[in-house]
Structure formats: C-alpha cells, structure tokens
Amino acid sequence: MAIRKSQVYLSTVNSYLIDSPQPSTINYWYNTGSLTGLCLVIQIASGIFTAMHYSSHIDLAFASVEHIMRDVNYGYLIRYIHANGASFFFVCMYGHIGKALYYGSYKSPRVLVWVIGVIIFITTMATAFTGYCCVYGQMSHWGATVITNTLSAIPFIGNDLVPFIWGSFSVSNPTIQRFFALHYLCPFILAALVVMHLMALHVHGSTNPLGISSNIDRLPFHGYFVFKDLVTVFVFLLIFSTFVFFSPNTLGHPDNYIPGNPLVTPASIVPEWYTLPFYAILRSIPDKLGGVIAMFGSILITLVLPVTDRSVIKGNTFKIFSKTLYFTFTYNFILLGQLGQLHVEVPFIEMGQIATFNYFTYFIVLVPLVSTLENILFYIGRVTTK
C-alpha cells in the first residue's frame, strides 16, 4: 500500500487533496472555495509580518503604519498585500456564497456545511472590522464609533455594553488595543472553522451544477481538479498583483490617510466596500433598534434557506423562475452596496428601504413561493410525459 494511504497523517491529506472523489461536472465557480482559502493563507502570512512592526497604542498606531510603509524593508508591499488581500478575500467569499445560492449547496444533506459557512462569514466580518479600526485613520476612528454605538440600541444592556467594548467612555487607547488583540486572534479561529467546513463537506462531497447525484461519475481530486484550481489561482494572482503594485489604494478610502481625530467628523462616514450592503440596511430603518436587528438579521436569515427552499431539484440550472429570481436578488444586493456609500438623502433613503424590503422578501416569501410553484410544474410535466 502507498505510504500516502498507510501513514496516519498522510492518509488524511490523501483523502482530502489527492484521492477525494469529485463530481466530473463541476465548473470554475467551484474554484472560489480554493481561492478563498488562498486568501486566508495570504492574510495570515502578511498579517503576522505586519504585526511585527505595528504598535496598537492609539498615539502610535497611525505612525506605526506609516513607519511600515516608509522604513521597513518591503513594508509597503506587506501592508498593501494585507489591505488589498482583505478586499479580494471578500470578493472570493461573495463569489463562493453566490455559487452556493445558485447551485443549492445549502440543501440537505449539506446543511451543516452551509451553517458553518455562515459562521465563517460572520467571523470574517468581525475580523475585517477590527482590522480596519487598527489603522486609526479618520475613517477608522469614526467607523469604530458609529458601528459600536449601534449596540447601544440593545434594550437594558446596550448603554452599558458600549463602554464595556470601548474600555473607556469613547473610542480610545483601550479600544484600539483590544481590537488589535481580537484582530490577531480571529484569523486562527477562522482557520479552525475552515477545517470544520471541509470536514463537514467531506462527508457527502461537493454538489454539482446539474443538481443530481454524481456518485456514478466522479474523478480524483489530484490531477484533474488540482490543475483546474491552479488555472484560477494564476488568474487571481495576476489580478491581485495588478492592484497591489499599480493601484493599491483603489479599494480604500482617502480619509484614512488622515490621523484619527475625534474632534473632526468626516463629511460622510463610509465603511469598507464589503460591508456596504449591510450598512445600507442598517441606515434604511428609521428606528435605531430596528436597524440593528435588520443588519444582523440580514446575515442570519441565510440560515433559513435550507428550510424555505422547498424545491425537489437542487440548483437553478434548469429552473427559469428561480434563475430569474436569483439574478434579481444579486442586482438588489449590488444596489444596496451602492446605496451604502451615498449620503442619507432623498431619493436614496426610499431606494434603500425598497432594496431592504426586497432583500428580506427574497428569503421569506419569494424562495418558498417560487420553489413550490416549480415543484407543481415539475410534477405536472412528469405526469404528462408518462
């Protein structure tokens, strides 16, 4: 027997990365998972080297970032890789989530994979938020102030919870230091969650675009899908390198090159682009508590999909109504992202409220309604063809 199969640790690697049977019909959208894993490795590696030269003291945080950029050998490269890596991490993650929504990867028997994936997404958002605050530029300070202040809407404990998180009566030195500690810790929690995600996936294997059982036609992972993944890895590295070397600040905000000043409020407080859809949902609800519930609910509501999607056919490949609904939802999500960076004024307020209503309607009403309708049409078609 080959050593990769007989040795305890190598046999585990073999079962996941070499002999793992994969559906022969999976397409390039399934590569977003491996790209997201690559981004996590890049972020952990670049983050460790950045942390070697970073100071989390509020008086030194901004200066230490400039020190990394100007004085550390290749510090500018490490910092730009880490900053742009965060954006590309979310690009790949949103693509991975979009693939799962389109191909029905959340349906039984892969519900656990989906639930762990949602937990990974929430943890990633927390990691990104705490990291964004560590720079302590003007947008970092006010972003931290606004987002943490939303927790004051929680009944009974909200007003005590916010100073507890800050460690003071405002965003100050204890806040930045504890945010940095959490930011350093969270990626390793993410890595553990990713391992759990892969373990849950390994039980039943990947889905496929056809939405049918692929047990009769599978191929080993190594040799076929390793090289298929490498194609998108090289394309990803090409695009990623273009941003890092030629346009490193495109995905950032210019106000964050101004040191954080609690006495000067920016013209508009805009978080990082990957949080904008949820920020738009937060702003669309006039009531503060309602906005906070809607923002967190917009992520947690994805957990109901395995229940609300009643379709007997996995995925949207052969379902025209679900496919149309999916692309409408995608457009609505992008619209929320655009509205999140605009000023709170007419007509953007009303547009945000309509887009927020459409977002929740998709999960609660449209998915069960359309999937039930398609089931009826499917059964009618099956009876008439007999």
UniProtKB/Swiss-Prot annotation:
Entries under InterPro entries matching the protein: Cyt_b/b6_C, Cyt_b/b6_C_sf, Cyt_b/b6_N, Cytb/b6-like_sf, Cytochrome_b, Cytochrome_b_C_euk/bac, Cytochrome_b_N_euk/bac, Di-haem_cyt_TM
Record bears the keyword rRNA-binding: no
Localisation: Mitochondrion inner membrane
Binding sites annotated in the UniProt record for a ubiquinone: H202
GO BP of this protein: mitochondrial electron transport, ubiquinol to cytochrome c
Note on how the cofactor is bound: Binds 2 heme b groups non-covalently.
Coiled coil: none
Residue ranges of the TM segments: 32-52, 76-98, 113-133, 179-199, 225-245, 289-309, 321-341, 348-368
Positions contributing to heme b b566 binding: H96, H197
Subunit and partners: Fungal cytochrome b-c1 complex contains 10 subunits; 3 respiratory subunits, 2 core proteins and 5 low-molecular weight proteins. Cytochrome b-c1 complex is a homodimer.
The entry's keywords: Electron transport, Heme, Iron, Membrane, Metal-binding, Mitochondrion, Mitochondrion inner membrane, Respiratory chain, Transmembrane, Transmembrane helix, Transport, Ubiquinone
Protein name: Cytochrome b
Required cofactor(s): heme b
Membrane-topology annotation of the record: Multi-pass membrane protein
Lineage of source species: Eukaryota, Fungi, Dikarya, Ascomycota, Saccharomycotina
A single Gene Ontology CC term: respiratory chain complex III
Function: Component of the ubiquinol-cytochrome c reductase complex (complex III or cytochrome b-c1 complex) that is part of the mitochondrial respiratory chain. The b-c1 complex mediates electron transfer from ubiquinol to cytochrome c. Contributes to the generation of a proton gradient across the mitochondrial membrane that is then used for ATP synthesis.
Any GO molecular function: ubiquinol-cytochrome-c reductase activity
Ligand binding (heme b b562): H82, H183
Family: Belongs to the cytochrome b family.
